[in-house]
Regions:
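Transmembrane beta-strands of outer-membrane beta-barrel pores
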Residues: 39-43, 52, 109, 113, ...
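Flexible, surface-exposed loop regions and adjacent strand-edge segments
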Residues: 50-59, 149-159, 223, 268-278, ...
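Outer-membrane beta-barrel transmembrane strands
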Residues: 2-50, 92-151, 217-251, 257, ...
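Gram-negative outer-membrane beta-barrel transporters
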Residues: 426-431, 435-546, 581, 610
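Membrane-embedded beta-barrel scaffold of Gram-negative outer-membrane proteins
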Residues: 346-348, 356, 362-364, 373-455
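C-terminal beta-signal and adjacent terminal beta-strands/loops
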Residues: 536-544, 561-615
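Transmembrane beta-strands of outer-membrane beta-barrel proteins
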Residues: 29, 33-35, 131-137, 250-256, ...
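Flexible glycine-rich, low-complexity coil/linker segments exposed to the extracellular/periplasmic environment
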Residues: 1-2, 62-101, 149, 158-226, ...
């Protein structure tokens, strides 16, 4: 039955706190020192995150009465869907069913803590080409704990701790699937701003549905899932030395930073099997609740007209906490130089080695492998929703290497008059490692059995990537306050190899790269007023790997507007329009066609108004 109506309802809060102390010490006119220490900690997440799903149908006897007789969609351009024009009215007439198998709750709560200390020392020189030297050390100790949980309601008379079989969705209430007109908004949602179109778009009235659950089942309960947590502890020790030099026309610096990272990543990885769903009758078909043989199973619940098996007979789940310790050290040299060829011409150069550690989620998100039997899939089809038979799953990659790159820049700038500059820059970045998402069928051995896990989602490292290109930029400001800024970047990347578990599994351009990117800003400014219009265009952006094909974000452009007015020297009014062009972002799979649509996203046209008071 289509369409399935679904959505989410969330109540959450977060608290972030920071405490810092900095001490600056002028040891002498030529020696300076600074010491900084602090702690930052935060916690937060939903107290409720609830999903409800429904279908436009109602069971009458042994048959279903459908509330929608037509479904069609078109994925060209802005995706659109078309349904029976009277779909909303049919829902109001009570032709609807709560899909209890797709009605659930899952929330995440996170705690983050970090302690840090940094010491910096500067030695100044009064004469000679050496301007100063700087050296110092920094220590960071960060911890992240994330756990998930559920908000649920249990049937009257059931143990509130019985999450598996006591929830109303588990079938202990045979009327749980009966949808009332009040569960839906009285009118279809009409203010669809972008991203997709639909001739009719019914919505779920979450406050009304949750109020119904509270009145029917006596209030909600929360539980924490011990089999869905992750922990990361990351200690970073670093020290640096830098020498700054200056002559009449040449200035710059050369230095090195040594960084040692100690990292512990732990997650709960689970294996869950969905073996069956409904009790079978003598012929092997799902047993109807009205079947005389059903009387022999008085504790079994009724769902969609059939007897649903208890959790322990239908599913099984095991999990284990898996942690990995890693330690690595990086030596990161850097060099910067600027040469004033003339009073208006400057040549700049830079070379450095940089790293970026993998994101916490990439190395510690809980893993999950799920098996769906043919019996389970067939039963779920009867109930109105089905997965694909076989193994599926996802998991983090605790062996991810940090992003590493050696980068070079060379630029020439011409300051041809006050308030005006034109420049050209060349760049090259040799990327040793980068992280990208991968979705692929993966052979695994699970409990001694060789299986094929379909569409396994994880993270992998890209190796030996190259990004090189040219940047053109300029700015010109007229005497009366009008000005323009422009920037264009051309970026050429190679096909980097993708490595997972030590094996090359494919190739991909450098993730996050776009061949072309341009920005143009027009502005006017005087003592009282500032107006700015910025147009940004980014070419096709490379994403991760999905079943051997690269994910691409199509070219995107956006216009932003900003104004500010100084009422007095102390008061300023501001206003902004973000995405004035109502641009949408479209993602597709593969370079041979744009027809494999993954998503089309509209972030909205956003308006901001503000006032600033300086005192």
């Amino acid at each position: 039955p289509t369409p399935q109506l679904t959505g989410g309802y969330s109540k959450e809060k977060a608290l972030s706190q920071t405490a810092d102390l900095t001490i600056d010490w002028d040891i002498s006119p030529l020696w300076k020192a600074s010491f900084t220490g602090g702690r930052t900690w935060s916690e937060g997440g939903p107290s409720m995150n609830f999903r409800m799903s429904a279908k436009p149908r109602r069971k009458v006897g042994n048959d279903y009465l459908s509330g929608n007789l037509y479904s069609a969609w078109d994925l060209t351009g802005t995706p659109s869907a078309t349904f029976s024009p009277d779909l909303q009215q049919q829902l109001m007439n009570g032709i609807a069913e709560v899909d209890t198998g797709s009605t659930d709750s899952s929330w995440k709560r996170t705690e983050v803590k970090q302690n840090y200390f940094q010491a910096d020392v500067t030695k100044l020189f009064e004469s000679g080409w050496l301007d100063s030297i700087q050296f110092g050390a920094k220590y960071r100790d960060g911890k992240v704990h994330r756990n998930t949980g559920n908000t649920y309601w249990t049937c009257q008379g059931r143990d509130p701790a019985d999450y598996k079989d006591g929830r109303y969705q588990a079938g202990c209430d045979p009327t749980a699937g009966d949808a009332q007109p009040g569960f839906f908004l009285s009118n279809p949602i009409s203010n669809i701003a972008g991203g997709f179109n639909a001739n009719v778009f019914p919505g779920i009235n979450y406050p009304a549905y949750i109020d119904y659950l509270n009145k029917t089942y006596g209030g909600s309960h929360n539980r924490t899932e011990e089999d869905f947590v992750y922990n990361v502890n990351e200690k970073i020790y670093s020290g640096y030395f830098q020498a700054n030099f200056r002559t009449e026309r040449v200035r710059g610096n050369v230095g090195v930073r040594v960084v040692r990272t100690k990292q512990f990543a732990q997650s709960s990885d689970s294996i869950e099997k969905f073996n069956d769903y409904f009790l079978d009758n003598a012929s092997g078909a799902p047993m109807a609740c009205t079947d005389p043989a059903a009387a022999a199973y008085p504790t079994y619940s009724c769902e969609s007209g059939f007897l649903r098996l208890p959790y322990d007979l239908a599913q099984s789940k095991t999990y284990s906490l898996i942690g990995v310790d890693r330690t690595y050290t990086d030596v990161l040299p850097s060099f910067n130089i600027a040469w004033d060829i003339t009073d208006t011409l400057v040549l700049r150069g830079a070379a450095s080695k940089v790293i970026a550690r993998p994101g916490y989620t990439d190395i510690a998100a809980p893993g999950a492998l799920s098996y769906y039997s043919e019996e389970y899939v067939n039963d779920r089809r009867v109930a109105g929703g089905a997965s694909t038979a076989g193994w599926v799953g996802q998991g983090s990659n605790k062996q991810l290497e940090p992003f590493k790159a050696t980068q070079f820049d060379l630029g020439l700038e011409w300051y041809f008059q006050p308030g005006a500059v034109a420049g050209v820059g060349l760049f090259r970045k040799n990327v040793d490692n980068f992280t990208l998402p991968v979705v692929r069928d993966t052979p695994m051995v699970i409990n001694g059995e060789a299986v094929n896990v379909q569409r396994y989602e994880t993270q992998a490292n890209g190796r030996d990537g190259v990004s090189q290109g040219v940047e053109l930029y300029g700015q010109y400001t007229f005497d009366f306050g009008f000005g323009v800024q422009a920037n264009y970047t051309y970026n050429d990347t190679n096909l980097a190899s993708i490595v997972l578990d030590g094996q090359e599994i494919g190739s991909s351009p450098l993730v996050g790269s776009a061949k072309n990117q341009a920005n143009v800003t027009v502005f006017y400014e005087n003592e009282k007023f500032l107006a700015r219009a910025s147009f940004n265009r980014r070419g096709q952006v490379v994403g991760g790997l999905n079943n051997g094909l690269t994910v691409y974000t199509e070219p995107y452009d956006q216009l932003d507007l900003n104004v500010a007015y100084n009422l007095t020297p102390d008061w300023t009014l501001t206003a902004s329009v973000i995405n004035a062009t109502k641009s949408e972002q479209r993602v597709h799979l593969g370079s041979d066609t744009k027809a494999r649509l993954i998503s089309n996203t509209y972030a909205g046209r956003q308006l901001y108004f503000g006032a600033t008071w300086k005192f």
